[in-house]
Amino acid sequence: MNRMDYQVERVEVAEQPTAVVRAVIPEEEIPAFLGRAYAEVLEVIAAQHLTPAGMPFGCFVPTEDGMEVEAGFPCSGPVVPARRVMPASIPGGPAARVLHQGSYDGVRAAHAAATQWLADNGWEAAGPPWEEYLDGPGVAEPRTVIYVPCRAVQP
C-alpha cells in the first residue's frame, strides 16, 4: 500500500490498563522479542486471574541504543509487577487511526500516512504511536492498526 491508499480517521480512545514487557533491543530482534513478551504477559495475567481485554500491541521508540519496545495486552484490570511484566496503560484521548494490511515490513507507510494526515488536518502527535495486531504472524496479509495519540495544533 502507498500512503494514498490509507484511510486515516480521528477516534477517541478510552484509557485502558495494560500489562507489558519493556526492553531496548536491536530492530532486527523485535519479532522474536514480541513473541516471548506476549507469552510472558499471558502467563502472568492468567496467574493473577486477569484476562486480555483486547489484541496484543507494541509501541516502538527509536533510541541511540536501538529500539525501545513496549509489548503487551490490554487487561481486565491492573497487573501486579511479576517477572518482566509491568503495569502500564494505553492513553485515553484523541488519536489518528489507520489500518495496514500486509507484511509488517510495509507498516512504516501507514505510520507516514498517519503523520501526514495529522499535519494536513491541524493535529500533532501527543505521544508515541502504538500498533495493535489483529492477526498473528502466520497470516499471509496480517492486519495492523496504528494509533497516534494527538492534540490540536495551537495557533
PLM-predicted stretches and their roles:
Residues M1-P155:
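A solvent-exposed interaction/effector surface
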